[in-house]
């Protein structure tokens, strides 16, 4: 992903270095726009959003709703719209306290996705309904 501040870019690059030996994890530190963005979203099974700073609690929430709109389960920072993961079983709050903790969580998350595909699909359907354009318009017109 793209980063807004130099310290975020440094943290992103550190994550990429820490996980460089995992060939099935890819980090893209660039802006993805238009069709390139859509193709990237369609090419993955799940989306990880490791926004670690408190300032991102709602600032970058759009990425979470994009993941929901593309029916993608998520590993999201606990700071990122936490009420969404509390209401819908569409992913987990990511634990980046250490490489072993994250590795264990990632393995468990993948196993859970495989074993509970229908649960994730049902919850992604419900989240899409709750955050639909139709419901947005209805709430605006009230």
Annotate each predicted stretch with a short phrase:
Residues 1-2:
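Short beta-strand segments
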Residues 45, 71-73:
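A short alpha->beta transition loop at the rim of the catalytic pocket in nucleotide-sugar-dependent
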Residues 40-43, 105-109:
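CheY-like receiver
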Residues 97-104, 111-142:
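A charged, aromatic-enriched C-terminal amphipathic alpha-helix characteristic of glycosyltransferases
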Residues 9-38, 43:
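Nucleotide-activated donor-binding/catalytic signature segment of Leloir-type glycosyltransferases, i.e.
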Residues 27, 74, 91-93:
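Conserved beta-strand scaffold positions in the cores of enzyme catalytic domains, especially
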Residues 49-65, 77-79, 83-84:
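Nucleotide-sugar-dependent
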């Amino acid at each position: 992903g793209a980063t807004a501040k130099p310290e975020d870019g440094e943290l992103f690059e550190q994550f990429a270095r820490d996980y460089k030996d995992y060939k099935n994890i890819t980090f893209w530190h660039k802006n993805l726009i238009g069709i390139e963005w859509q193709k990237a979203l369609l090419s993955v099974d799940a989306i990880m959003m490791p926004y670690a700073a408190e300032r991102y609690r709602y600032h970058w929430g759009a990425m979470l709703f994009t993941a929901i709109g593309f029916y993608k389960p998520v590993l999201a920072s606990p700071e990122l719209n936490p009420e969404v993961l509390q209401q819908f079983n569409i992913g987990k709050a990511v634990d980046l306290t250490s490489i072993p903790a994250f590795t264990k969580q990632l393995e468990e998350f993948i196993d859970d996705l495989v074993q509970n595909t229908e649960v994730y699909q049902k919850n992604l359907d419900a989240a899409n309904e709750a955050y639909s354009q139709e419901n947005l318009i209805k709430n605006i017109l009230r």
